[in-house]
Regions:
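Conserved alpha/beta enzyme-core scaffold
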Residues: 1-339
Length: 339
């Protein structure tokens, strides 16, 4: 998931599993991307007979949209794993940097992708944990996102993925005048609500409109001397710019969306890695979603009663992911849909 369209870990793992003759597996992934079309063959062969994920895209989504899958939000997935409702037998975790004992991170190495927020929960609760890396370093690796105490074995491969493809597709900056107009209206609503003040907290998505809203808010905050407490969620270069320019005290990062954000989490101690439990587990002792003042939600469909679809197109074909949308919409003081 963290390498998104650049991921090469899942295809390599599934090829080995299929070659061993293993069948009837449930794939419990935090999310699936366009480059995971190889799963179609493994489903047809019976290697994979069940999928739990927040979403998927591309040919894989089209192929199985008429089948039965169980979509889960990021917070809901963490909750089900921690409460033992979903037991993970083996977690294969891609790490851009790892030592021989399994201490690992995602912010160093040639395939650096940033936060390992989703994998942290898997590492804590899976029966067996396999670290997969293309950058084996002398002991101890530093920093440590997932420690050796959670890891059963380390596998070195030629390449875990292409970090240049992390931001492809779902993350984009828009120049579309309609989308910019929507973003302008959305920022005016947030400001008029009286929530943009010193100490406020914020989450923006990775879509074009959401990122444009953040840029409009940045201009307003700088013009009025406003500094928020934190921004959270999937972190993009837009959010790291706001951190560097004094708009927020900190960033809480469960997933890093582009190269600039990877550099930020590596170099700036104010850019903090968090796991999916801390982010949005509804039954955790405390989660970040419930501390949000404002969250921006992109959608594929919205009806006149404000019911929101973020997973499928109007024809029922899966084209996105639940992500943390329902989690943060439930927790934030203001949930704003832009579409």
């Amino acid at each position: 998931h963290h390498l998104r369209n650049g991921d090469l870990v899942l295809p390599q793992v599934m090829a080995e599993i299929a070659a061993m003759g293993i069948r009837d597996l449930t794939l419990c992934a935090s999310s699936l991307s366009k480059n995971h079309t190889c799963l179609i063959d493994y489903i047809r062969l019976g290697v994979i007979t069940g999928i739990e994920t927040s979403g998927m895209r591309g040919e894989l989504a089209e192929a199985i949209s008429r089948e039965c899958i169980l979509p889960k939000t990021h917070g809901g997935r963490a909750r089900s794993i921690e409460r033992g409702e979903r037991r993970i037998d083996v977690a294969f975790i891609g790490a851009s940097c790892c030592d021989n004992m399994g201490n690992m991170n995602g912010c160093l190495g040639p395939s650096a992708f940033g936060s390992m927020g989703y994998a942290k929960v898997d590492a804590r609760f899976a029966k067996k944990v396999v670290a997969i890396t293309d950058h084996l370093v002398p002991y101890p690796a530093n920093p440590i996102s997932i420690p050796q105490t959670a890891v059963d074995c380390v596998v070195q491969v030629e390449r875990i993925g292409d970090p240049q493809l992390i931001s492809q597709g779902a993350t984009r900056k828009t120049r579309n005048p309609v989308e910019l107009a929507i973003a302008d209206y959305a920022s005016q609503v947030i400001i008029a609500a009286g929530l943009v003040k010193n100490g406020f907290s914020y989450q923006a998505g990775s879509g074009g409109i959401s990122l444009a809203v953040a840029r409009y808010l940045k201009d307003y905050m700088k013009a009025n001397g406003i500094k928020g407490s934190f921004a959270s969620g999937g972190i993009t270069s837009t959010m790291t710019e706001m951190l560097q320019e004094g708009c927020f005290e900190a960033l809480l990062d469960v997933q890093t969306f582009d190269a600039d954000a990877v550099a930020s989490i590596r170099d700036d101690p104010r850019h903090i890695e968090m796991d999916a439990e801390m982010y949005a587990d509804p039954q955790a002792k405390g989660n970040v979603a419930n501390e949000l003042d404002v969250m921006i939600l992109s959608a594929t469909e919205v009806d006149t009663n404000f019911n929101v679809n973020v997973l499928t197109a109007s024809d029922g074909v899966i084209m996105g992911a639940l992500g943390g949308h329902p989690d943060t919409a439930a927790g934030a003081n203001l949930a704003l849909v832009v579409a």
